[in-house]
Amino acid sequence: MSLKPTVPMTTAGRGIAQADLAGRFVYKFDGNALRNNIVHRICGIGQFTLDAAGQLSGSHTSSGMPLQGSVKTGVLVGTYVLTGKMLLGSDASLGDAHIAFRSETPGLDSVDGKFCFAIAGAPDRLWLMSTGATIMGKPEPINIAELVIIEAIRIAGS
């Protein structure tokens, strides 16, 4: 008797094109970010639509709290509108994303985020990790030290 996995054991390889990633995805994320020299734990959920050319639009809700010191205001919760681009690399299994997270919550910053992503077996599941972030709308760029991992699952085709 031969056992075959239902999902390939390795990430997707050749044969995947940018247009194969088009569709609507839901995702969850969590990680840490340094703000005012204090580490904050952040997590959230959201959704995005990716078109055949890699244009991305969506929204998410996140929460965060400092991991040291007092929490005077409790958990910070914010909502964001997303716009950006996710482009598959030449090896057809890894790519890069550049996403603007525009805050809809007074007092919370908008962020320009950069990510590396991998196709996790098939184009219906993507893994992303942060590779850089900058606070938007300031006179000079303010880099954010953050480490975030995201898992996105396609719920509808293009």
Model region roles, listed by residue range:
Residues 1-158:
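Mature soluble binding/inhibitory domains
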